[in-house]
């Protein structure tokens, strides 16, 4: 984990708000601040939808950690520290879910970068109670609020967006939760990748499955493949599972930080990899994925990657595989292919 993010630094200036509280941390938290916060609080729990962060917290037994698309466990918390997520709809989702769980009387601290749209909390929280900004620093804002109105019961079904994808005469229903890549649309990069793929057979893994578009189209066109779909986001995992069910398709969907929890000997690795971490652009995870992919392929297996054309991924694949082919290219996207 890196040094403290700017939202954590502004929270660090306001430790009195957390003194002796049972704090539940949620949202776009990326650093060790919850561990330091434990010194000032009665207890600290972390609910995260990010499997990588959840895995890193395993080293800190003083923190109770929860991973999933929904917090189902019973816990003692009287204050939520919400790190504002990059998607406004995800913030609405987290508020509705967590406040329905904890109820009236719950205090909330919201921290986030101003460019992320954290100011939206002022209107968003109105249904729950008062909230005000109490600090600004490092281009971030610090809000404190109090839930005084009874939150509505939370029903996750109300948060799915369903939309149709028509591909080669097959109409698929895609189910997507807030915060999932390409929420509510069939992105052009995924379409180009599907247009370029050969007929598939054997073990196929879709890494960074999002709402499950790639995996489900591959399963529809190649019904005999053994399909796995992974993502670092619990919201994406649930979305991919729902998309499979909606289309009566089969596959194994599970959380993994790139190859952290996957198997080996895949015949095909197919990926539309993410390159955003929070609000920042980050390529390190994808570069690691490309470099390690050769170790997870069967002999004769291949990787197929879609990426923005300007990204310098071919040298990484060339170093790992000894070659890299550009299978397709547009003004915006390129399809890279390498075979073991």
Swiss-Prot record:
Main location: cytoplasm
GO cellular component, one term: cytoplasm
GO terms of molecular function: 16S rRNA (guanine(1207)-N(2))-methyltransferase activity; nucleic acid binding; rRNA (guanine-N2-)-methyltransferase activity
GO biological process: rRNA base methylation
UniProt keyword Hydrolase, yes or no: no
Keyword annotations from UniProtKB, A to Z: Cytoplasm, Methyltransferase, rRNA processing, S-adenosyl-L-methionine, Transferase
Protein's cellular compartments: Cytoplasm
Assigned protein family: Belongs to the methyltransferase superfamily. RsmC family.
Protein name: Ribosomal RNA small subunit methyltransferase C
Gene name per UniProt: rsmC
């Amino acid at each position: 984990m890196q040094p403290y993010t700017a939202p954590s630094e502004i929270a660090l200036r306001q430790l009195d708000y957390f003194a002796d509280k049972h704090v539940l941390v949620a949202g776009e938290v990326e650093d060790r601040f919850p561990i330091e916060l434990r010194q000032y609080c009665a207890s600290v729990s972390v609910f995260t939808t990010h499997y990588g962060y959840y895995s890193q917290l395993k080293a800190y037994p003083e923190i109770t950690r929860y991973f999933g698309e929904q917090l189902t466990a019973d816990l003692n918390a009287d204050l939520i520290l919400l790190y504002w997520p990059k998607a406004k709809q995800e913030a609405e989702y987290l508020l509705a879910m967590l406040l329905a769980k904890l109820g009236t009387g719950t205090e909330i601290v919201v921290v986030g970068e101003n460019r992320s749209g954290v100011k939206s909390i002022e209107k968003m929280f109105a249904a729950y109670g008062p909230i005000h900004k109490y600090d600004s620093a490092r281009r971030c804002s610090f809000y404190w609020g109090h839930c005084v109105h009874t939150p509505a019961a939370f029903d996750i079904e109300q948060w799915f967006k369903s939309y149709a994808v028509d591909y080669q005469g097959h109409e698929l229903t895609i189910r997507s939760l807030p915060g999932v890549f390409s929420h509510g649309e069939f992105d052009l990069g995924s379409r180009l990748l599907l247009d370029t793929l050969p007929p598939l057979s054997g073990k196929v893994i879709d890494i960074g499955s999002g709402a499950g578009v790639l995996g489900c189209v591959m399963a529809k066109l190649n019904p005999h493949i053994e399909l796995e779909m992974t993502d670092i986001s619990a919201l994406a995992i649930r979305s991919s599972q729902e998309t499979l069910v909606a289309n009566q398709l089969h596959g194994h969907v599970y959380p993994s930080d790139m190859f952290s929890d996957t198997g080996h000997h895949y015949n095909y690795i197919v990926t539309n990899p993410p390159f955003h971490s929070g609000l920042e652009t980050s390529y390190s995870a994808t570069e690691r994925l490309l470099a390690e992919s050769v170790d997870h392929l069967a002999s004769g297996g291949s990787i197929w990657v879609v990426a923005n054309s300007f990204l310098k991924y071919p040298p990484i694949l060339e170093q790992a595989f000894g070659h890299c082919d550009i299978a397709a290219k547009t003004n915006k996207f390129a399809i890279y292919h390498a075979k073991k």
